[in-house]
Amino acid sequence: MWEEPCISGTRGSGAVFFSGCGLRCVFCQNERISQKGEGKQVTPKRLSEIFRELEEQGAHNINLVTAAHFVPAVLDALALYRPNLPIVYNSSGYESVETLRMLDGAVDIYLPDYKYIDPNMAAMLSGARDYPDVAHAAIAEMVRQTGAPVYDENGMMMRGTLIRHLVLPGLTGDSIRILERICDDFPGIPVSLMGQYTPCGRALTMPGMDRKIRKKEYARVLAYMEAVGLDGYRQELGAADGAFIP
């Protein structure tokens, strides 16, 4: 799986996708997995074997994608086999602190989204009016567990939290407010500023959400990120692979 350079490196991240999601994003690109339950059932033993196989294939880390509702099974699998690799918890940010505390000591890297700061937008676009407060509390817990980011000699993240934010069309003001809050509340935590929003699914029928973001929209948010000195990654708009640049 391709992620930010400090996660994907040269050999890729060993992604394990879990069916289902607590959000109902109108622009979700993985609806078959997140909302329609596509996937196959595996036991904790088989999951532990998948971890081993990804390790043997050379993955830089084990990347657990939307695993919140399978945390007990994930912990059982890690008890059976703990790879000698960082464990990445790849999250929408819509997580309970109680669930995250179960992962304390098991997860090395948290990769949460920080999608919304406006409850009305969170309700309209993801069906979760409480997302801003829930995500902020969740990220605070993630940062508490991991502390400041730690990298190896090749720039690979070995421990830490990397916050992702996707700029949405017409909502640059909200994006700037999110970056401001990250700067104030999570100093030293890197941010991945994403610009690859692609209208799909229900978003195609929603005025304002039925287009990609404009370069000037992304540029405005990026300029703020640079002005306040937030460390992290930006995305090259229009690049075939949506490449991230440190």
Feature map (PLM): residue ranges:
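Hydrophobic faces of well-ordered beta-strands that scaffold small-molecule active sites
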Residues: 14, 62, 87-89, 110-112, ...
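Aromatic/hydrophobic pocket-lining residues that form the small-molecule binding cavity
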Residues: 47, 74, 100, 135, ...
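Alpha-helix-loop-beta-strand connector modules within alpha/beta enzyme cores
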Residues: 77-88, 137-142, 215-223
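Conserved Radical SAM active-site core
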Residues: 1-110, 118-120
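Auxiliary Fe-S-binding modules of radical SAM enzymes
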Residues: 147-246
